[in-house]
Amino acid sequence: MIYVDQAPLQNYLSDWGPESGNRGMNNPQALEGLQRTLETDPKTAHLGTIAACLGYRSHPRPGDPTEGSKEWQEDEAFFLKEALKGDGWWYGKLMADHTALDWRDAIKHSFGSGSGSTTKTLVVASTRSGCFPSAGPLKVVDLANGGTEGGHARGVAVEWGGHWCYWEKPEKFNELVLEFLSE
């Protein structure tokens, strides 16, 4: 199993806050605002998603693509075209489901110590994600390994991309995945 920059919970709760949860989509008010924007101004909503999901936009570094560059423009055109094919109301419902679900117990019971699972798990987090601090996705490793080292799950925090690191650096991502699959 491979998780890519996805924390087991997006919303903030008393035991889960900004150190692990989603940077922006983490409470009912944020969800309501996104849903409204998806219905009334979908282009703006999708441009916000693109900005958060591409590391070179959310956490730019020297040498990264810049606004106006070919890569910036092509990525934006591609993702915006694809996103605008969908219905904003349905995207809003999907995000309501996506943000509210808390997978921590399900991961612990399905893959953790005592579950009997031997499923190998790779968690790819990003230090440049506009969606999650890397600690959120990496919590999956702790849950699957029961808080001990040497379990079936391992995690890595990459610096070469954001939430969509597989898009930004597909060769590096594929190398990471192929190495994991060959273990």
Which residue ranges define each predicted feature?
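Flexible "cap/lid" loop of the alpha/beta hydrolase fold
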Residues: 1-42
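Low-complexity, intrinsically disordered short segments enriched for Gly/Pro and polybasic residues
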Residues: 7-10, 26-33, 78, 100, ...
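Active-site-proximal flexible loops/turns
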Residues: 12, 16, 94, 166-170
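Short, flexible/disordered intra-domain loops and linkers
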Residues: 14-21, 64-66, 131-139
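Alpha/beta-hydrolase
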Residues: 22, 37-129
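Conserved loop-alpha-helix segment in the C-terminal half of the alpha/beta-hydrolase fold
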Residues: 110-162, 167, 172-174
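C-terminal alpha-helix
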Residues: 176-183
